[in-house]
Amino acid sequence: MTLLTAFIMTASCALAEGAVRDFTLDNILHHPERGDIHFNLYVPDSYDDSQPVPLYIALPGWEGLYFQGVGADLEWETMPFAAREYDPDMIIASAQLNDWGMTSALDAIALTEYLISAYNVDPNRVYLSGYSGGGETGSLVMELRPELYAAYLMMASQWDGELEPLAEARTPVYMIIGEDDSYYGSESLKNAFANLHALYEAKGLSDAEIDDILILNVKDADWFARRGISDQHGGGMAFPEEPGLLEWFFSKTKKG
């Protein structure tokens, strides 16, 4: 392994050999407080540090956690590759964390802060997504540091975080899930959507203003059947195909 020349917050990052579809595998952020944080990284060939670029961080589900093996996330997850096709000039990190709770939420925040500092990242265009357990982690990130991100995409998951900090930050959130998700069901996201919507209403936002920053997209059985998918949870890997999803997500920029 070779050390990157950047040392951020007295943290260093090591690069492992190997790549999968242009992602370098098992980069390790040696964080002084959080310990080692593993992630796979795509830096476009066009990147030269002269212009700020967007940053997107994906939090995989259980099948992509680090104990499953280096690069396991890239064997299953579709969103990092869909994002690269959508904007090949974006830096993309697929994190391989250790759980779907507060430990990984803090690790995800530390990784985000490191990458913003290590590369010429546009701080107004930093995006986070979470699938399955990674979605639970992402909802905790939205409780802790929602202002760090331009938008959050939550796929096939349940909401674990507190909503008030998110409502204060007004970070745009897109939730998508199968009506009969085989692992979570859809009630958790329906409730989170309703409660967050109510918080925005209480803050005086109009329906149009809320619609601009909060979406709940519940897919019925026909949506999956048309794609030959029998399981609505695992079928969440097809969500990047949803028309308008990527455009909505990556069009958001932080205000102010």
Where in the sequence are the language-model features?
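Short, proline-enriched alpha-helix->beta-strand connector loops that line the catalytic pocket
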Residues: 88, 167-173
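C-terminal catalytic histidine-bearing segment of alpha/beta-hydrolase fold enzymes
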Residues: 174-176, 180-184, 190, 199-256
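Bacterial N-terminal signal peptides
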Residues: 1-11
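Solvent-exposed loop/turn segments at secondary-structure junctions
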Residues: 61-65, 97-102, 132-136, 157-161, ...
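A domain-start/cap signature at the N-terminus of enzymes
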Residues: 13-55, 136, 140-144, 203-213, ...
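Primarily recognizes the serine-hydrolase "nucleophile elbow" in alpha/beta-hydrolase
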Residues: 118, 124-168
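Gly/Ser-rich "nucleophile elbow"/oxyanion-hole loop immediately N-terminal to the catalytic nucleophile
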Residues: 46-51, 100-132
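Active-site machinery of serine-nucleophile hydrolases
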Residues: 55, 59-109
